[in-house]
């Protein structure tokens, strides 16, 4: 009896995978190219990766370390070994939520995310514990554990010009029947996305938005083009957390997240890294910088208006030392250049500054943060790097 039930469950799970329409790289090691110099690019400080570096991976965000910008994704189909894909954000790694720039701390646990993952940053190979060799043979994607981009479903699909056309709702079958939202994709095929008709779980926990308000399921009509966010569902399904029936409702969410982002960066400062340094014999020096990408355009405009930005050195996690404003060095900007079509991770903005004092962290390839004309606030003390123990604690991700 148990064998029969198990067989029926496995058959149903197989049908769910086929119905989901995921476009994913093959998991078989035989199908994994042994050598691919672009995919297997090893990132180094001071150089942005080439286009196409790394792999696409998706899963539910189940673990976050917001201070050090690390986390773990879970594949709902149970195929990943180890069961979570742990990762660290690259210094220039970008997060998007509801179509706006974000930080890991903004993402609710359980949110289904898409990411672009590279091999570890040179010098940071031990930051994320490496899977066992037998696990890597079966699941080679586990080696790619430094993220350059992480985004929820609505950000991912909307960025690629995709939406979902509602076909209707239907009662699902299987051992645990659930109501299903039947949809088909509208727009181009997307690497790592769902590229054919799909069924998503929908129930009373799903938030349905119209005219910037919560509405009932009776507002769901066949033919509507919508955006959705997803999470884990039983038997390898995906469940809807939010459905936006009109652009106005999604825009309201995007603006709220944008304001969160502005508040965060104005208090933590804009990140970038040092390109070149010239030390003066009598103290001080000159420095050229590149600002990281993925920030709201208003922040770049505000930093451009600040001809004397204060600059603090920072860790690869973007954390700063103690009172980051008090220890930041005032500068005089001498050059500002905006380059078109920058590589992923870069804003394309380069600037040169002169400084009366050169901190130890002002070295080529090292991370810095720039303060504009923003009100200074004292950060929570657990975000500071103060003692050697703090560096040791931040050097590796502690797995749950």
Describe each model-derived feature in a short phrase:
Residues 1-2, 26:
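Initiator methionine at the very start of the polypeptide chain
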Residues 22-92, 97-205, 209-400:
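Short, flexible, surface-exposed loop segments at domain boundaries
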């Amino acid at each position: 009896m148990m064998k029969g039930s198990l067989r029926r469950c496995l058959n149903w799970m197989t049908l769910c995978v086929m119905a989901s329409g995921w476009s994913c790289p093959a998991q078989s090691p035989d199908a994994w190219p042994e050598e691919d110099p672009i995919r297997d690019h090893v990132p180094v400080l001071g150089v942005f990766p080439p286009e196409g570096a790394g792999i696409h991976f998706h899963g539910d965000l189940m673990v976050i370390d917001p201070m050090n910008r690390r986390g773990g994704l879970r594949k709902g189909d149970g195929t990943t070994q180890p069961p979570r894909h742990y990762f660290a954000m690259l210094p220039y790694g970008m997060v998007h939520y509801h179509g706006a720039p974000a930080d890991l701390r903004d993402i609710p646990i359980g949110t289904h995310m898409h990411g672009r993952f590279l091999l570890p940053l040179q010098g940071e190979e031990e930051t994320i514990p490496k899977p066992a060799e037998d696990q890597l043979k079966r699941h080679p994607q586990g080696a790619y554990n430094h993220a350059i981009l992480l985004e929820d479903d609505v950000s991912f699909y909307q960025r690629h010009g995709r939406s979902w056309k509602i076909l209707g709702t239907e009662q699902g079958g299987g051992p645990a029947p659930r109501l299903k939202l039947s949809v088909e994709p509208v727009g181009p095929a997307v690497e790592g996305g769902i590229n054919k008709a799909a069924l998503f779980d929908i129930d009373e926990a799903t938030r349905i938005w119209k005219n910037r308000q919560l509405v009932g399921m009776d507002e769901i009509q066949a033919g509507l083009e919508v955006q959705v966010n997803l999470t884990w569902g039983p038997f390898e399904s995906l469940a809807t957390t939010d459905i936006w029936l009109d652009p106005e409702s999604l825009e309201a969410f995007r603006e709220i997240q944008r304001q969160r982002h502005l508040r965060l960066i104005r208090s933590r400062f804009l990140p970038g890294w040092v390109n070149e340094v010239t030390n003066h014999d009598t103290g001080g020096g000159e420095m050229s910088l590149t600002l990281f990408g993925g920030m709201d355009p208003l922040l770049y405009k505000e930093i451009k208006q600040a001809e004397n930005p204060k600059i603090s050195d920072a860790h690869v996690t973007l954390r700063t030392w103690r009172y980051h404003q008090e220890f930041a060095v005032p500068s005089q900007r001498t050059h500002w250049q905006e380059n078109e079509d920058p590589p992923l991770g870069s804003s394309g903005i380069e600037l040169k500054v002169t400084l009366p004092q050169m901190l130890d962290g002002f070295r080529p390839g090292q991370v810095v943060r720039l303060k504009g004309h923003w009100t200074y606030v004292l950060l929570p003390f657990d975000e500071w790097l103060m003692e050697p123990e703090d560096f040791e604690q931040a050097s590796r991700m502690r797995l749950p």
